[in-house]
């Protein structure tokens, strides 16, 4: 349980900060790629 919370908390924060950054700077393909991977991992952890 501890592991899930620890891994989920930082992921959620990143996900929330990513969309804000994208809105400010729409020209960030590298960040978007990283965000996509993070989102996938976050989903897997949440489902697990």
UniProtKB/Swiss-Prot annotation:
Residues 20-48 have a biased composition (Low complexity). It comes from Dictyostelium discoideum. This is Putative uncharacterized protein DDB_G0276433. Residues 1-48 are annotated as: Disordered.
């Amino acid at each position: 349980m501890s592991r899930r919370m620890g891994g989920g908390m930082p992921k959620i924060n990143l996900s929330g900060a990513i969309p804000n950054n994208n809105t400010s700077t729409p020209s960030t393909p590298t960040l978007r790629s990283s965000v996509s991977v993070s989102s996938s991992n976050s989903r897997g952890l949440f489902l697990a």
